[in-house]
């Protein structure tokens, strides 16, 4: 209808690389993020008009990605409409999920898996837990309900922003999050811990 071409990885031409659709299984919120080979989406208003007719539509964004590789998402995103994120729950923990952050594709099964992990971890309330590659803090915040302290490490800054916001949303104050490579952050904080004890 708008004659917008899809991206061709071989030639590097075309605009629409991917369409990421996220759905909050418990909240019924929907996010659409179009990954584009450029900076803008022509005739975006027409697309927005159509998408907001869908029940539950909460966020419409674009993520520019002009790299000549097969990495899906760009390094940033622009909000075209809505709040720029959706929310969902795993158990009784609420999560804010932005376009660039990893979120489990099947939160219904994830809730069961995390419940088992929490049961098997048999946390008594005096443990310190490190969640390496923590994403938006799904496991971290789930375990923080039973642990004394939880630390999450993730290389994606937007995911850590979401993790910190998720801790705030849930009034969880025994979780801290760090941006960086796990293999660098963990030894640094372990050395600091050793000096203090």
Question: How does the language model describe each region?
Answer:
Residues 1, 38-58:
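Short, non-transmembrane amphipathic alpha-helical segments
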Residues 1-8, 21, 26, 41:
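Extended interfacial segments that mediate partner engagement and assembly in macromolecular machines
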Residues 10-20, 68:
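Glycine/charge-rich, flexible interdomain linkers and switch-proximal surface loops
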Residues 21, 28-37, 94-98:
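Short, aliphatic-rich beta-strand segments
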Residues 25-28, 82:
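Short flexible coil/turn linkers enriched for glycine and charged/polar residues
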């Amino acid at each position: 209808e708008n004659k917008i071409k899809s991206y061709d990885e071989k030639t590097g031409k075309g605009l629409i690389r991917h369409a990421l659709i996220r759905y909050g299984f418990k909240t019924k919120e929907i996010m659409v993020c179009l990954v584009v080979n450029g900076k803008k989406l022509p005739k975006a208003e027409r697309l927005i008009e159509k998408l907001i007719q869908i029940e539950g539509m909460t966020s419409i964004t674009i993520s520019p990605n002009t790299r000549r590789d097969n990495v899906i998402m760009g390094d940033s995103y622009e909000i075209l409409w809505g709040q720029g994120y959706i929310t969902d729950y795993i158990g009784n923990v609420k999560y804010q999920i932005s376009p660039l952050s990893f979120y489990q594709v099947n939160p219904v099964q994830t809730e069961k898996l995390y419940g088992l992990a929490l049961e098997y971890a048999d946390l008594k309330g005096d443990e310190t837990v490190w969640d390496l590659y923590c994403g938006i803090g799904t496991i971290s915040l789930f375990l923080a309900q039973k642990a004394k302290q939880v630390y999450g490490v993730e290389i994606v800054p937007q995911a850590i922003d979401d993790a910190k916001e998720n801790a705030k949303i849930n009034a969880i104050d025994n979780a801290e999050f760090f941006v960086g490579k796990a293999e660098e952050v963990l030894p640094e904080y372990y050395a600091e811990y050793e000096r203090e004890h």
